[in-house]
Regions:
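Short, conserved catalytic or interaction motifs in soluble domains
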Residues: 13-16, 75, 99, 146
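A short beta-strand-turn-helix
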Residues: 33-35, 40-61, 84-87, 130-132
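Short active-site neighborhood of thiol/selenol oxidoreductases, capturing the structured segment around
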Residues: 52-71, 94
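Loop/turn elements at helix/coil->beta-strand transitions in domains of secreted/extracellular proteins
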Residues: 58-61, 90-93, 117-119, 146
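Structural microenvironment flanking redox-active thiols in thiol-disulfide oxidoreductases
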Residues: 74-115, 124-131
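Thiol/disulfide oxidoreductase modules built on the thioredoxin-like
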Residues: 110-118, 123-168
């Protein structure tokens, strides 16, 4: 009886037609989840230069969602600049998306200068936040590989060394 049951289970699983059409794995994964594709975006950074997904193709990309009032963000950002200084020549880039809230009391350009940040910083509009799957907390860091696939997502503070360990295999 056991052999018959196992045989029927095996036979039932041999259907030639799948229940749903096949889709690329990345397309089936929700935005902002590990394995999802980097969303298409085109934004102006704080000085007014256009930053697009197109110019990031073929690079390892760290996306950082931050705010001027966020203490963990202030601790992380200089480390991301150090990683950019170290790995930029190998095709690594950092883009910072600033949350625009009533808590902001410091000019973001002065804030970046004070922290020694030279990578592009743009405002995280609601549309941008949604394209990245919604942002659950600050800081939120996302690391995409050269094919634009999300390989690491960190919500909250993380030491630069841990981010670097996740980053190095992608370079």
């Amino acid at each position: 009886l056991l052999c018959l049951s196992l045989g029927l289970l095996g036979f039932a699983g041999c259907n030639e037609h799948s229940a749903s059409p096949s889709t690329p794995v990345e397309a089936a994964i929700a935005a902002g989840e590990i394995g999802s594709r980097m969303p298409d975006f085109s934004v102006k950074d704080l000085p007014g230069r256009q930053v697009t997904t197109e110019e990031l193709r073929g690079k390892v990309v760290l996306i950082d969602f931050w705010a001027t009032w966020c203490e963990p963000c202030k601790r992380e950002m200089p480390g991301y600049q150090q990683l950019l200084d170290r790995y930029g020549p190998q095709g690594f880039v950092v883009i910072g998306f600033k949350f625009d809230t009533m808590k902001d009391t410091e000019d973001p350009m002065r804030f970046a200068k004070r922290l020694g940040i030279h990578y592009p910083l743009a405002v995280a509009t609601e549309a941008v936040k949604q394209k990245f799957g919604g942002i659950e907390g600050l800081p939120t860091t996302m690391v995409y590989d050269r094919k634009g696939i999300l390989r690491e997502k960190i919500i909250g503070f993380e030491y630069t060394e841990a981010v670097e360990r996740a980053l190095k295999p992608l370079l």
